[in-house]
Amino acid sequence: MGKLLRKPLNERIAPGVTLVQDINQGNSPLSYVGFRLIELEKGAVYQEALTDLECCIVALTGKITVSEGDDIFAEIGTRANVFEKIPTDSVFISGGRAFQVKADTEKARVALCYSPANRDLPTTLIKASDNSIEQRGKYQNKRLVHNILPDVSGVASSLLVVEVYTNGGNFSSYPPHKHDRDNLPAESLLEESYYHEINPEQGFIFQRVYTDDRALDETMAVEHQNAVIVPEGYHPVGVPDGYDSYYLNVMAGPKRVWKFHNDPDHEWILERD
């Protein structure tokens, strides 16, 4: 199965560009989802040529300029810190195209989210104001959601991207749910990656990834800028008191539909008044 918890790499890959996370088909059990996290110093440039993958570039912190052909999106990004809890700007780029990202502020943190390019689509700026915002859950199961690329969006061919905030003392991705069977309309098959940040940064959260038969069952203490791979199974997150959690989810599979199945042992939680 491979290691599900990924610690920061912090590798310098170009002048002023640091690779923090790199998840791909070659180093993980995933077939549909890829993820990179890069940090750029002011003026530094990251370049990439896409082949059979599409990419959503998310300006996590700082301001960046994204260029693809004649399309230039200058000084996008809305936050100095993800825990400002406001939506940010993103750019979608289809397969077979080359792009570059340049940092316009002293530092910029950028997420690169990948999935198979099933058809050619226009390069698109996804403004912060385009994100739909949801407050989900109740009791100790509350979270704030920013939908960047939900399944109702026609911007991408296979990619789903969402940001989730969970306050201390709460659980999210909870009751535990999974989406690892191509069994629509009951359930869709979507792989998933989690990129985590924690406030304050010295904190940690817990994430469990498990299947019904427990053939896969890993519980991880996840720290700031760690990533977690979810090739299958349920994947709840618990946040200790005193710390806030942020994570960026990337999902993809054979069909661009998010339909999950709750763990029947814990679904009763939803039935409370």
Swiss-Prot record:
Belongs to the isomerase IolB family. Pfam families: KduI. Its EC number is 5.3.1.30. It catalyses: 5-deoxy-D-glucuronate = 5-dehydro-2-deoxy-D-gluconate. Signal peptide: none annotated. It comes from the Bacteria. GO terms for molecular function: 5-deoxy-D-glucuronate isomerase activity; glucuronate isomerase activity. PANTHER family: 5-DEOXY-GLUCURONATE ISOMERASE. It comes from Listeria innocua serovar 6a (strain ATCC BAA-680 / CLIP 11262). This is 5-deoxy-glucuronate isomerase. Keywords: Isomerase. Pathway: Polyol metabolism; myo-inositol degradation into acetyl-CoA; acetyl-CoA from myo-inositol: step 4/7. SUPFAM superfamilies: RmlC-like cupins (SSF51182). GO terms for biological process: inositol catabolic process. Involved in the isomerization of 5-deoxy-glucuronate (5DG) to 5-dehydro-2-deoxy-D-gluconate (DKG or 2-deoxy-5-keto-D-gluconate).
